[in-house]
């Protein structure tokens, strides 16, 4: 049975953003993909809703997704969308979580970590992180991962930022497409492992 991806956007850009659409196009090669937007985005506001409302919107989108598939469901999200997916998985059963740039440290502050939800998880999770992401220093993520109960995996993008983008000078002979294809392969492997 084909996997189903519920793809949540980050805080700053809606699901129509080219970055989201580009990844949606890739994910369609593995399974069915549905994107959605949080209420504040639909209302044209910049500031995200409070956590309970973000979770409620995400759960509503998940309920709609369940009506469309009986296959394995994966919550995938860019930054905030991945974090909210983690919260949703504490209340709803899904096959796995895929976080594209998890925002571990609030506003890049190493003392304010959004790690409790990760410690509470039972759902398998794949982190896709850039090594230059100020919102998720890899040393801090490593410490959190060591204390997590859920099966957790990390795909690191050397030189990648919060949007998984690698600067030209760091790419060498590679292209961003090469980097993205490796991310896609990691996602594909994770999904295959947890699709039963």
Regions found by a protein language model. Give the residues of each.
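Serine-hydrolase catalytic machinery in alpha/beta-hydrolase-like enzymes
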Residues: 2-73, 84, 89, 164-172
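Primarily recognizes the serine-hydrolase "nucleophile elbow" in alpha/beta-hydrolase
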Residues: 58-120
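Conserved alpha/beta-hydrolase "acid-adjacent" motif
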Residues: 16, 134-140
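Catalytic histidine neighborhood in serine/cysteine hydrolases
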Residues: 32-34, 147-168
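Catalytic active-site module of serine/aspartate enzymes centered on a nucleophile-bearing elbow/loop
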Residues: 58, 160, 169-196
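Active-site nucleophile loop of the alpha/beta-hydrolase fold
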Residues: 10, 38-39, 99-107, 130
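Acidic beta-to-alpha connecting loop that harbors the catalytic carboxylate
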Residues: 11, 131-133, 159-161
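Short beta-strand/loop motif that positions the catalytic acidic residue
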Residues: 121-122, 127-129, 133
